[in-house]
Design a protein with these regions (language model features):
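An N-terminal-biased, well-structured beta-alpha scaffold segment characteristic
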Residues: 1-60, 195
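Phosphate-binding beta-alpha-beta segment of Rossmann-like dinucleotide-binding domains, i.e.
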Residues: 63-121
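Glycine-rich Rossmann-fold phosphate-binding loop(s) that bind the pyrophosphate
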Residues: 127-128
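N-terminal Rossmann-fold NAD(P) dinucleotide-binding loop
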Residues: 131-132
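Aromatic pocket-lining residues of Rossmann-like dinucleotide-binding sites
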Residues: 137-138, 202
Length: 233
């Protein structure tokens, strides 16, 4: 990709490419022929904005372009994770060829039941295009939904179900959550939003979903919380 940057006028940066070359883009010397960089998504933390501004390179993103696709994945993970579907599938595959298959299934299936979502509480951090969709879907599943977003737009607010409860601070939200999902861009101010301090506020056994940016979660704090049972595995 870096070699091609010297020969094109527009660079389209997809999420897949970001995973394999974000550092390269931040440190790349752009040719004078480069006019614009388009980010397929909302976050632009993988693009050197100051340098692009100095060189007159237009940078634009496409927030919400894949919002529905991501929201569906979040809901899928919410259901499958809570009901232990991945573990159950792996276990079932291990029964292949068993002479006592029906008996084995009947005996072992209860270990994968997992909690139902209806009546449980989910906290949604960030109520933009993706977070709002996740919140509304969770309402439809019969969950109690708490929302936290100090920068929520008017359009996003109008799109939310009336059933979504507004939390002024994370301290108001976290102690009540059985599930927690985060949907904010990566900025210096949002780095490690989920950390040892915020996890300590949560219920024991909280389930955490992050389909936004890895940098939003302190991995060491998360590993510790998984080890103690503060966060469900």
């Amino acid at each position: 990709l870096n070699k091609n940057l010297f020969d094109v006028s527009v660079v389209a940066v997809s999420s897949k490419e970001k995973l394999v070359r974000s550092a390269d883009l931040l440190n790349t010397t752009f040719n004078d022929n480069l006019l614009a960089i388009a980010r397929a998504g909302a976050g632009v933390n993988n693009i050197p904005l100051d340098r692009c501004s100095e060189q007159g390179i237009v940078v634009f993103n496409t927030p919400g372009a894949n919002a529905n696709a991501v929201a569906e994945l979040v809901i899928g993970a919410l259901v499958s994770g809570s009901r232990n579907v991945p573990d159950a599938v792996q276990w079932a595959q291990g029964l292949k060829g068993s002479a006592t298959l029906a008996k084995d299934v009947e005996k072992g299936k209860k270990q994968f039941v997992g909690p139902e979502l209806r009546g449980k509480t989910i906290g949604v951090i960030g109520l933009g295009a993706i977070g709002a969709r996740v919140a509304n879907a969770a309402v439809a599943l019969g969950m109690e939904v708490l929302g936290y977003d100090p920068y929520i737009s008017i359009d996003a607010a109008w799109s939310l179900s009336r059933s979504v409860q507004h939390c002024v601070t994370l301290g108001d939200m976290l102690p009540r959550c059985d599930y927690l999902t985060i949907h904010v861009p990566y900025l210096p101010s949002t780095k490690n939003t989920i950390n040892a301090q915020t996890l300590a506020m949560c219920k024991d056994g909280v389930r955490v979903l992050n389909f936004a940016r890895g940098e939003l979660v302190d991995n060491f704090a998360l590993l510790d919380a998984l080890g103690t049972g503060k966060v469900a595995q």
